Amino acid sequence: MKKIVYYIAVAFLAINFSSCSDFLDLPSKSKTDSESVFSSIDKAEMAVLACYTGVWMQDAWYKAQNGTDEMWSTESNSNANNYAANYVLNDQSCPTGIYTTSYSSIERCNSCLKGLRAMSLSGEDERKCHIYIAECLAVRATCFLNLIRYFGDVPYSTVPVLDMTTFSSSRVDRDEIYDGIIADLQEAVEVLPWYSEGFFSTPERISKNAAYGLLARTALYAAGYALHWDLNTYDKSTLQMRRPLDESRVRKLYTIADEACKAVISKGENSLLSKYEDVFRALNEGGVYNPEEVMFEYAEFGNTTNGRVGYTNGLCIHASNALYGKTLPLQLIHPTFYLSFADDDTRRDVTVGNYSIDAAGNDIAVPYGALNLGKWRCNWKAGPRTATLKTDVNWPILRYSDVLLMYAEAENYLNNGPTEAAKAAYEQVRLRAFAGDASRIGTTPSTYDTFFKAIVKERAFELATEGWRRTDLIRWNLLAETLAETKAN
């Protein structure tokens, strides 16, 4: 009897230990290694969403945007935040936030692409997988474009760090990178759904519409001027400000941009809002989307990605204002830029804030030397901020008006003068600016040079303070000339 009890006890203990072992061997629900993440399409989607964090960042609209004909920084030259704006060359002038954030997202894209391509799926899950792959290609291309815009020739990798044969990399010729990311975007536009298909619920993710616009933008930058040098020697004497040496390459790139814009325009899904102000009121209010015009916007929400949009680059609001909360603008509009707008251009008083707000909520006029950036206004928000420095204001990375102006620019180049389609695209942007009154938009230029100069001006008026002016001027080889003119005025 004792032996029977003993055997039962031993068996019971064995079962318990076995159960305990099985319990301890249960997979972790929070495990985030590649095998776990890419075990289902829903988990894989979460990984893809994480890739978007590096497509835009504060350094892009602050440190790297100042110092043009549009705006300037109020910080002193002894402050590292202002070095890039004032073209002070030292180790601290580099806006490292762009570099580290972009490469972080690129690594996530590379890891996702490897994981997604290894998944074995069928039906709707397989379709989703292909779309997520296209998303990652488009996000990675966007990150590399930002790196090239600010740093020129940079390290270029399309595989995860764990798969690299070396952890060090020299600079790669930007033309090689451009070829790679243009090919990625061309692959992406074939797979991504149009926004109207409803696959994406907000323009915070890249639809086919947005991918075409990003492709056009990338092609125009690839065709533009840039500072090239010998990447074998890094000899400063080899520095040249030039376009790609092969004119046929330049023409091919303009053709890519032209056709990408044409694809968006001919689809007919996108349009301009009737009022310019409504674009930015919606962005400031939060949770209001206008995908017909704002084709791709950077989501600013939560404790990890939320930025200072409107705090650092908006209206000046008194610290004691209880309704809107304090702001501390460190960027101001040049008086010359404000005065360059036509008086009846409705974009002027949206782009430029010619008042501040006192503690009681009253508007106080400011002098020309203290003109604020007007597109980002905390008094346009629908509710309170997440915190003083967290405003929940999304950033417009791509708008339809940009697509129209890129199309006009490409058509002008390819035809040695503006086509009727180029003029129509240009005039569509102008008409909205002047409240639909065709008699106020002026005569549209008809020669290559005059139309190009009109595009240069119109992009300044339409896209001011949205992060493109400085690098637009570089790709046109107009930065030095424009800065000299601004300083003289």
Task: Indicate residue ranges for each PLM-predicted region.
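TPR/Sel1-like alpha-solenoid repeat signature
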Residues: Y212-T218
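Membrane-proximal, proline-rich intrinsically disordered regions
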Residues: C20-N66, S237-T238, F280
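Short, surface-exposed recognition loops and adjoining beta-strand edges that mediate ligand/DNA contacts
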Residues: W61-T74, P193-A210, G224-L315, G436-T450, ...
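Elongated scaffold/linker segments in the mid-to-C-terminal portions of large proteins
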Residues: D42-K43, V48, Y52, W56, ...
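Bacterial N-terminal signal peptides that target proteins for export
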Residues: M1-I8
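Conserved, well-structured interaction surfaces
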Residues: S40-M57, S78-F151, T165-S201, L373-W395, ...
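Bacterial Sec-dependent N-terminal signal peptides
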Residues: I4, L13-S40, I181, A216, ...
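Short coil/turn linking the two alpha-helices of tandem helical-hairpin repeats
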Residues: I148-Y150, P155, S196, Y221-D230, ...
